[in-house]
């Protein structure tokens, strides 16, 4: 997970200190999801199908600045990225 895999493994990642608890919770939700519909709750996830350069990906929000982007295939998330959208 490109430098943030430690978040999922309960390690502290200095770059993400301000969002680590929320990001960890969202990564766990993503890991546990059996379908995209599972990610619609809570509504704050704001599950979106992305377009443009990220066509084929989906995202859930960590906060107003950060999103977790991923490709959903065969009931699992692949190519997971924690992305600064600003």
Can you name each region flagged by the protein language model?
Residues 1-26:
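Arg/Lys-rich, positively charged N-terminal/basic patches that mediate binding to nucleic acids
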Residues 51, 57-86:
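Enriched for short, Lys/Arg-rich terminal
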Residues 34-58:
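A short, surface-exposed loop/turn module that caps and links secondary-structure elements
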Residues 18-42:
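Short, solvent-exposed, low-complexity loop/linker segments
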């Amino acid at each position: 997970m490109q430098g943030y895999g430690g978040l999922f493994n309960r390690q502290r990642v200095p770059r993400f200190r301000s969002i680590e608890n929320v990001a960890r919770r969202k990564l766990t939700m993503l890991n546990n999801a059996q379908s995209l519909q599972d990610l619609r709750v809570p509504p704050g996830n704001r599950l979106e199908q992305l377009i443009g350069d990220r066509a084929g990906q989906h995202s859930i929000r960590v906060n107003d600045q950060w999103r977790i982007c991923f490709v959903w295939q065969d009931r699992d998330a692949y190519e997971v990225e924690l992305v600064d959208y600003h």
